[in-house]
Each structure stands twice: as C-alpha cells, then as structure tokens.
From Swiss-Prot:
Species the sequence originates in: Gluconacetobacter diazotrophicus (strain ATCC 49037 / DSM 5601 / CCUG 37298 / CIP 103539 / LMG 7603 / PAl5)
InterPro entries reported for this sequence: Trm112-like
Protein's name in the database: UPF0434 protein GDI0182/Gdia_2252
Recorded superkingdom: Bacteria
Pfam families per record: Trm112p
Family listed: Belongs to the UPF0434 family.
One Gene Ontology cellular component: cytosol
C-alpha cells in the first residue's frame, strides 16, 4: 500500500486519537492520507495504514 492509496481508517481508532500537540480532535482526509489538526495547523501522515503522530513528521497546513 502506498501513501496515496489508503485503506479506510478504522472509525474506532479515529475516535480515540487526538492531536499530540493540542490534544484536540483530528479530521481524516482519506484522499491525502492524513489526519488533520486544524487547531495545530498540522497534517499527520498515515503510512501503510498507521497514523504517524509525531509532530516532527507532520507537515504544516497552508494558511
């Protein structure tokens, strides 16, 4: 599986994950394969179905 072809993220997993920076909610962007934290302005990648919740691995959102 590549970063651009993501399997659906389990809704149960999404319900327990929070942004590691703000502890706020995340939004799943299936097309981009990312979990978005609007509060932190960061997009966390999902690689091979595994969310990478490290702030150093996140990309800043365009303002």
């Amino acid at each position: 599986m590549t970063e651009t072809a993501q399997a659906p993220l389990d809704p149960r997993l999404l319900s327990v994950l929070v942004c590691p920076v703000t502890k706020g909610p995340l939004i799943y962007d299936r097309e981009a394969g990312e979990l978005i934290s609007r509060q932190a302005g960061l997009a966390f990648p999902i690689r091979d179905g595994i969310p990478i919740m490290l702030p150093d691995e996140a990309r800043p959102l365009d303002v």
